[in-house]
């Protein structure tokens, strides 16, 4: 009987152990979730950041991680102290460090969406750091496939990253800059954003400003170069014509001074009228050159205005730019 009771007890003990072990496993699996949830309870976003969070249409998981990394909008000096580690003048819009997110507080109305996009970008860094190696590996092929198809958008400089960093950057950039992703990737990002396309809209909203500006500058430069060539050709044509005309006028005047050089009044008048006609035609060439020069100067002025505008935008997004008092 004793043996039977002991056996029963062992069965009971074994069962209890199994239950306990399952409980430990469950806690282990959810520890990060619980930790993020608890940390997030202490998050007190500003009104602006709260609006940004709402605009991203985060899922429960996305909102939990967002709150846990406590994104903050930072002004220039404080942002540079936290996010800029060198004297590089490269524009840095945000950073994820020590499981916190910091976003450069860019308020330019022309660049609407840039803070939302940056917040989403840095959030995905936090998400990626929470992913298990196996989950990352499952996405590797898809991320590389999308990159191959979108190098013009994502930039070939990504190839300069080391493999691990490259995959993380692809994960973050593709999730915030590319629409119409493979279904498996879309489903993955849907765990964070209810509408990943909406996040990409924020990216396109501000990046379009720079792309339009770049296109405008290229178009203006083409017009400037074409006019420059036309002015050069027309100027040479005018100078050659003026040289020949002046020579012929001098010959005509010398002939007019010489008795019997012109055989008749008709010949005199005919040659004189021909010179006057040529002079008028050359004057039209001169006016045409002036018109080209006016157009050229107009395009140059417009080009310079756009350059200044572009520099101002770059200063706006670049926290390393030193603002000097005028």
Which stretches of residues belong to each language-model region?
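N-terminal Lys/Arg-rich, disordered targeting/topogenic segments
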Residues: 1-8
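Metalloprotease/metallohydrolase-associated module, dominated by Zn2+-dependent proteases
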Residues: 2, 14-29, 44-98, 139-242
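Alpha-helical transmembrane signal-anchor/signal-peptide segments
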Residues: 34-48
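Short pre-active-site segment immediately N-terminal to the catalytic Zn-binding motif
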Residues: 102-119
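Active-site recognition of the HExxH zinc-binding catalytic motif
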Residues: 117-130
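Extended alpha-helical coiled-coil "stalk/arm" regions
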Residues: 234-269
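C-terminal amphipathic alpha-helix
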Residues: 278-326
